[in-house]
């Protein structure tokens, strides 16, 4: 598995705080049953969410689901 860095995720969502919130929202979606958009393996939901974000599978618009 490739190592995930904050810098990879910040390329998609430049604001560190919004990036954290977006990954948290996506991880919650995965933990309650949403299908991962990548090969999840045995990773935890937050790791899956960060990998998805680094691969540009979602963006900051996910924050609109909580507002």
Curated annotation (Swiss-Prot):
It catalyses: RNA(n) + a ribonucleoside 5'-triphosphate = RNA(n+1) + diphosphate. InterPro entries: DNA-dir_RNA_pol_omega, Pol_omega/Rpo6/RPB6, RPB6/omega-like_sf. Signal peptide: none annotated. Pfam families: RNA_pol_Rpb6. GO terms for molecular function: DNA binding; DNA-directed RNA polymerase activity. Keywords: DNA-directed RNA polymerase, Nucleotidyltransferase, Transcription, Transferase. Its EC number is 2.7.7.6. It is an enzyme of class 2 (transferase). GO terms for biological process: DNA-templated transcription. It comes from the Bacteria. One of its GO terms (cellular component) is DNA-directed RNA polymerase complex. The RNAP catalytic core consists of 2 alpha, 1 beta, 1 beta' and 1 omega subunit. When a sigma factor is associated with the core the holoenzyme is formed, which can initiate transcription. Belongs to the RNA polymerase subunit omega family. HAMAP family: RNApol_bact_RpoZ. This is DNA-directed RNA polymerase subunit omega. It comes from Nitrosomonas eutropha (strain DSM 101675 / C91 / Nm57). The gene is rpoZ.
